[in-house]
Amino acid sequence: SEXASQNYSFQAEVAQ
């Protein structure tokens, strides 16, 4: 999302 990870945050946000 913001500063997490452009790869992990993408799946993390969509999953949540």
Curated annotation (Swiss-Prot):
It is found in: Cytoplasm. One of its GO terms (molecular function) is ATP binding. Transmembrane segments: none annotated. GO terms for cellular component: cytoplasm. Induction: By heat shock and primary alcohols. Keywords: ATP-binding, Chaperone, Cytoplasm, Nucleotide-binding, Stress response. Homodimer. Belongs to the heat shock protein 90 family. Molecular chaperone. Has ATPase activity. This is Chaperone protein HtpG. The gene is htpG.
